[in-house]
Amino acid sequence: MKRLRAQVASFDRPARLLMVNQFAINCGFYMLMPYLADHLAHGLGLAAWAVGLVLGVRNLSQQGMFLVGGTLADRYGCKPMILAGCALRTVAFGLLAAAASLPVLILASALTGLAGALFNPAVRAYLAAEAGEERRVEAFATFNVFYQAGILIGPLAGLALLALDFTVVCTVAALIFGTLAVLQARALPVRPPADRGAEPIWRAVAADWRTIATNRPFVLFAAAMSGSYVLAFQVYLALPLQARELFGDRTGLVTGAIFSVSALAALSGQLKLTAWAKENLPGPRAIVYGLTAMGAAFVPLLPGSHGAVVGVGALTLCAALLAWGGALLYPFEMDTVVRLSGDRLVATYYGAYNTASGIAISLGNLAVGALFDTGVHWLPWAVLATTGFLCAGMVTRLNRAGYLTPRPTVVAVQG
């Protein structure tokens, strides 16, 4: 804790505000979302297809709009997009508190996703610009501590509020985002966007997107890293499925413990891992080590049968290694995206990167589900482990080929 306080204090006020902002964003989001499906199915009595539709709309609207959100941040400034995202979440969660019909639920879900697409790229671009090249890695490491703390505390707060009513959960979450919007409107300094000239907006945006699509190092890096997001998501898919197979009706307790282990491992290891890696490893090598650890996380689950004790140990070790691997690579990954952008259109690059990751998660989860349906116990874990090792190999090749060498700065980030 002392190390964290010192690290936070070393940054300027805007960076500190963004870190606290991300903690509150995740608290508000995760106090509600883990319990939404149960509320829709049992509280409102929706059919399973309708529950899937509502949740799917949220994911589609967020992943599909990340690129647009990043583009808007680069064109109009990061602060307006952060404020707009928080305001939209306030409205969306307020609608969820009152909604009883499917059309209103779909609208609320779409607004929830759109809000994330607006503020996520903007927050990261603002933080990258505020920290500067020398301190970007440390800034994103500290940012991730707050990010993970929100993931840990949010569901616990939601569970406590759920004892009252799901409407209370939605209302509190909406109030959190409303408060964030007001506080940041008053306290977050404006960073004017770069001068975009007199070119028509549609033509300028098309040129920006074309620049990103033809940035071969960035496209290859995004493709290589997409597997890491599929692996990280398995805390919510493959590990609970395995827990269900091992523990039946006690799955909820085991899954909750897995989530806690994952968040606590990231919280406890983030700053130490980053400090060690920055002192001993170049950025690309740190990413490779992180990907390797994430692939290795699934190896303990390969044996064909587990008793209860061994099963819990394997699941816990998998969750911890996934968290540590992700913590090791994350700050260097975020820094690499900025470097590959040439410090230009940073929010748009983050938006494109998030969109690619979201597509990978959707396709990867379909594949993982299909692998479980084969009934071959070891197959999902073997494929997941291999994915991590292949991604590590791809990043190694990109680095050796010189693709991850920083590009020269073209225009300083202003948005």
Task: Give a label for each model feature.
Residues 1-12, 189-221, 415:
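Juxtamembrane intracellular "pre-TM" segments in multi-pass secondary transporters
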Residues 80-94, 285-300:
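Structural signature of the two symmetry-related core transmembrane helices
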Residues 162-175, 370-388:
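A membrane-interface helix-boundary motif in multi-pass transporters
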Residues 109-148:
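Cytoplasmic helix-loop-helix junction between adjacent transmembrane helices
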Residues 34-49, 237-254:
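Short amphipathic helix-loop junctions that connect adjacent transmembrane helices
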Residues 59-67, 151-152, 263-271, 361-362:
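Residue-level signature of mid-helix packing/kink "hotspots" within the transmembrane helices
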Residues 63-100:
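Conserved MFS/SLC helix-loop-helix module at the cytosolic interface between two early adjacent transmembrane helices
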Residues 65-77, 268-283, 372:
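Helix-to-loop junctions at the C-terminal end of transmembrane segments
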